[in-house]
């Protein structure tokens, strides 16, 4: 089984690359793809860059060049669930865009025209992630809605609006829905796994800088544990 793994930033993929056996690196359009073995599986780890456009480019290149059987998106996120702390993990139950609005044409808020309102992760990948939670010790993990947009969220007014639009949102980030949409187009199974680096509030810029390495490491450990379940 060949698995593609996508993270936006170096701290989000560093532990994965360091843990790989026989890594081989290729760069296409400024995006690095590292192929090798991880947890007994053939993997391609990709550092996409930040945001929905670069994530879409990276996902398309990954699928076209390497033909993975499934894709895992890993990394950090801002937390919206009251019972989660920095470092805890959200496994996607569904993924949506929070910054898309074509409701004038009868679509749901967050739904791009001619696309589903929500992108649903692969049930087998989610089940493997659930089993992997037990190996993480004291790190808490839940399933929940993950929303994506091209903004770093730290404004309480914007947070309030987002929760009005998506009241069950557990986390927000900047790549997941774009990756999920590309996977949907190519019919490739996916799951998004994110560790919280901040709580999407006024302290988020400080928290993010302080905790991004911790969040990236926790998310990477979760990915490795998931691979061991496949």
Curated annotation (Swiss-Prot):
Substrate binds at residues 78, 153, 174-175. One of its GO terms (molecular function) is adenosylhomocysteine nucleosidase activity. Pathway: Amino-acid biosynthesis; L-methionine biosynthesis via salvage pathway; S-methyl-5-thio-alpha-D-ribose 1-phosphate from S-methyl-5'-thioadenosine (hydrolase route): step 1/2. The active site is at residues 12, 198. CDD domains: MTAN. It catalyses: S-adenosyl-L-homocysteine + H2O = S-(5-deoxy-D-ribos-5-yl)-L-homocysteine + adenine; S-methyl-5'-thioadenosine + H2O = 5-(methylsulfanyl)-D-ribose + adenine; 5'-deoxyadenosine + H2O = 5-deoxy-D-ribose + adenine. It holds the Pfam family PNP_UDP_1. Transmembrane segments: none annotated. It comes from the Bacteria. Keywords: Amino-acid biosynthesis, Hydrolase, Methionine biosynthesis. The keyword Amino-acid biosynthesis applies. GO terms for cellular component: cytosol. Its EC number is 3.2.2.9. One of its GO terms (biological process) is nucleoside catabolic process. Catalyzes the irreversible cleavage of the glycosidic bond in both 5'-methylthioadenosine (MTA) and S-adenosylhomocysteine (SAH/AdoHcy) to adenine and the corresponding thioribose, 5'-methylthioribose and S-ribosylhomocysteine, respectively. Also cleaves 5'-deoxyadenosine, a toxic by-product of radical S-adenosylmethionine (SAM) enzymes, into 5-deoxyribose and adenine. Belongs to the PNP/UDP phosphorylase family. MtnN subfamily. This is 5'-methylthioadenosine/S-adenosylhomocysteine nucleosidase. It comes from Shewanella pealeana (strain ATCC 700345 / ANG-SQ1).
């Amino acid at each position: 089984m060949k698995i593609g793994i996508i993270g936006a930033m170096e701290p989000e993929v560093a532990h994965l690359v360091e843990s790989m056996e026989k890594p081989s690196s290729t760069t296409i359009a400024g995006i690095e793809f590292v192929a090798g073995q991880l947890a007994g599986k053939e993997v391609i780890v990709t550092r996409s860059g930040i945001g929905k456009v670069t994530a879409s480019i990276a996902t398309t290149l990954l699928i076209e060049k390497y033909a993975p059987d499934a894709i895992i998106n890993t990394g950090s996120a801002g937390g919206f669930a009251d019972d989660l702390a920095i470092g805890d993990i959200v496994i996607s139950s569904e993924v949506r865009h929070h910054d898309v609005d074509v409701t004038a044409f009868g679509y749901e808020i967050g739904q791009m025209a001619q696309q589903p309102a929500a992108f649903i992760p692969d049930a087998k990948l989610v089940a493997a992630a659930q089993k992997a939670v037990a190996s993480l010790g004291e790190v808490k993990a839940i399933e929940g809605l993950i929303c994506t947009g091209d903004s770093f969220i730290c404004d309480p007014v914007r947070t309030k609006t987002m929760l009005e639009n998506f009241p069950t949102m557990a986390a927000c980030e900047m790549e997941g829905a774009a990756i999920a949409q590309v996977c949907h187009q190519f019919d490739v199974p996916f799951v998004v796994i994110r560790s919280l680096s901040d709580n999407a509030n006024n302290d988020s810029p400080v928290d993010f800088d302080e905790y991004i390495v911790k969040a990236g490491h926790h998310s990477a450990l979760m990915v490795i544990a998931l691979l061991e379940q496949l």
